[in-house]
Amino acid sequence: MYEGVIQDLIDELGKLPGIGPKSAQRIAFHILGADPSQVRRLAEVLLDVKERIRFCAICGNVAEHEQCRICADPRRDPTVLCVVEEPKDVVAIEKTREFHGRYHVLGGAISPIDGIGPDDLRIRELLQRLADGTVKELILATDPNLEGEATATYLARLVKPLGVRVTRLASGLPVGGDLEYADEVTLGRALEGRRQLDV
């Protein structure tokens, strides 16, 4: 245990997701040993992000303007909408360079244990986006866990009367993975989602 501002810094860093006490301590001592200009720049960037970044008025992704760059891009296919839980999921899908539609960020997943219900998510905004009939396919890309599955099922039932095609991301074995280490659910999904091998 340290005293004063050093311990305050360690405590604050430890509040960040994925940062445990040891990592917080390492980062704190890195900051202490860093050049003052680097520390000042880090502090400025943190403040700048908090002041300038907002959520896109259309999809809920992070943005510096009213619309994010994806919603503002006329080359994106407006007929395909990919629903994700968080902005970080948009980044993950964009890295594939395979998806050319638009997104809708829910801001989480249904989780009764955590007190998060449908009204706590951006589901009302999703329905408003679907109302004009432009979207023909809704891809549900929520996490493949209990909360993500519950959210996907809820949305699929909610959207069904609108006549929009609803699809779910395939799930299964990772590339380079070994079958013996796959859990039963993952292996079962991989079998369900199998496809013909064209040679």
From Swiss-Prot:
**Where does the source fall among the domains of life?**
Bacteria
Q: Which Pfam families match?
A: RecR_C (PF21175), RecR_HhH (PF21176), RecR_ZnF (PF02132), Toprim_4 (PF13662)
Q: Quick one: a GO biological-process term for this protein?
A: DNA recombination
Residue spans, zinc finger C4-type: 56-71
- For the Toprim domain, which residue ranges apply? 79-174
Which UniProt keywords are listed? DNA damage, DNA recombination, DNA repair, Metal-binding, Zinc, Zinc-finger
Q: Which Gene Ontology molecular function entries are recorded, alphabetically?
A: DNA binding; zinc ion binding
What SMART domains has UniProt attached to this entry? Answer: HhH1, TOPRIM
* Protein family: Belongs to the RecR family.
What is the recorded function of this protein according to its Swiss-Prot or TrEMBL entry? May play a role in DNA repair. It seems to be involved in an RecBC-independent recombinational process of DNA repair. It may act with RecF and RecO.
Q: What name is this protein filed under? A: Recombination protein RecR
Per the UniProt record, the source organism is Acidothermus cellulolyticus (strain ATCC 43068 / DSM 8971 / 11B)
